[in-house]
Amino acid sequence: MAIAMLTVVRAHALQPVFGGLDRAVRFHRILGPSAIVLLIVHVVFLALAQLEGGTSIGDLFIPFWSESARSMDIIIFYLLLLLGGLAYDRRMSYERWLSVHRLTGLVFLGGAAHAVIEPGTIADFEPLRTWMVILILAGGAAWLYRVVLFNRLGPRYLYLLKTVVSRGNNIIDLVMLPVDRRMMYEPGTFVFLRVPDMEGQQKELHPFSISSSPVERDLRLSIRTVGGFTRRLPSLEAGTQLDVYGPFGGFTSHRYAPFRRLVCIGAGIGITPFLGMLAFEISNRDFRRIWLYYVVRDEKDAVYDSEIRESYLDTESYIDYELWPTAHRGCARCAGCLTC
């Protein structure tokens, strides 16, 4: 669990270790369930050994069953199972999901204290005990920075909203101007956005991909309005202060600079990072061959189709662009893309 917390700490110094925050998040999604499974295995084997020694099931699994019941350990175990399950509940709103993750860190610290203090292999073998303490301190520091300190100490840039452009199909563009220093970023990265004046959500950070080129002064985020926070964005007025944290992510065209041929597939709002890459190709003199497939349900969902055709195809690089409406052409598969 400590490593899982380190993966999503949002510290620029740790991004290269995991290949960018986007890859770190995918790794985090593997580590989280793995930690829960290992916790269950640990408890099962421990319970079997205790049952053979004459301990009752109530003392092992029911808090406050008797004076000998390890109530605090039992409560922490159930809390970790509950929070671990809720973390993967897709029906939960983003705000509640975020709160669950914050609480998980506190429960982790309680479990970590149990692991270090409780008599057993860790306490008896000093090198293992030292390693566990290092992991716990690293995980605890990651949680503290991520939950408590990031809003103040994170890589924040102040922007003012210039305009909100409605693209249709519940998609908008937020175009903003820097207040003082401009954020430097690579095409394809993403940021966390906060609106300090949004009542009830002043402290919330939401991730969005950048769809503008780093050579432009304006910063553009392309957003699908599907949640409580995003549905309030179209009503923001010009001049509203926006806090932008970033940039994050390793999915950039610079990462694949040695490759002369690129195949890019963007589905729905997933076309966003490729818009920034295409915009950058206008000023990039390094020739490469690019195949871009814009996958949508039908043509009316392709809100960036005209922008791609009118603005990005006339570059130094050769861009072969294909709109792929699945309602007429079916799912986009590798064989179909290569033969079209």
Task: Report the location of each language-model feature.
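Membrane-embedded alpha-helical bundles that constitute the cytochrome b-like, heme-associated redox core
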Residues: 1-174, 179, 326
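Reductase modules of NAD(P)H-dependent flavoproteins
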Residues: 106, 110-116, 123, 228-229, ...
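Ferredoxin-reductase
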Residues: 153-243, 259, 282, 288, ...
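A short, basic/flexible loop-to-alpha-helix module at the beginning of a structural domain
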Residues: 247-258
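Conserved beta-strand elements of the Class I
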Residues: 261-265
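Histidine-anchored nucleotide/phosphate-binding helix
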Residues: 271-285
